[in-house]
Amino acid sequence: MQRLVLALIAVLIYQYSSSQEKLGRPFFTGDINFTLGINENYQIVPDDDNGPLIVPSALFFRVGFGYEFKKRIAVAFNSGYDLHWNYDIKAFPTYGSLKYNITEQDDSTHFIEVRYGKMWTPSSNYPDGNYYGIGLGIQAGGEDRLNTTFRIDFHRKGIVGFKNNRLDSVSFGFGFSFF
């Protein structure tokens, strides 16, 4: 009886692995995002020596790996490095993400992605905190298995010492996904 069950399971696994329609596919992803902020030293005066009103304020690097199901839903684990030079904050977020492709046309998709995880800070100035994010983006199909992504994201980092003990930012980014 055990041999029959094992043989049946082996046949089912073989059938599933050789079938035409696959459940999904693994992928590797990477992003670079930047955040713009208001220049706190900016003043409206005739001599404009205090710089522009809007200045870059942060840079985020992200890498991750995950699995896409039926070209509609993707689950991934990501890690990264965040640098907020205005506040001298360096952080390492690690988080899980859930991406849903809203539309798909000619290998290009529009998607929404939510993120939740932990943020680690190497400095003793700020304690570790939580990391949340939500974003919209476009993934453009490229050569073979490499796709380009463009995105806009809202990030919330739980950091004690800021207003409401959090640091919120909106970032613009581009990246890739390799299937």
Locate each region found by the language model.
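A cross-taxonomic marker for long C-terminal extensions/tails that follow the last structured domain
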Residues: N147-K157, K163-S171, F176
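Bacterial Sec-dependent N-terminal signal peptides
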Residues: M1-G24
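Gram-negative (and chloroplast) outer-membrane scaffold detector with strong preference
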Residues: I38, L59-G135, A140-L146
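Outer-membrane beta-barrel "beta-signal"
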Residues: N33-G37, L98, N165-F179
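Surface-exposed strand-loop-strand hairpins of Gram-negative outer-membrane beta-barrel proteins
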Residues: G37-F60
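Extracytoplasmic loops and strand-loop junctions of Gram-negative outer membrane beta-barrel proteins
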Residues: I44-D49, M119, H155-G158
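Transmembrane beta-strand segments of Gram-negative outer membrane beta-barrel proteins
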Residues: E21-E40
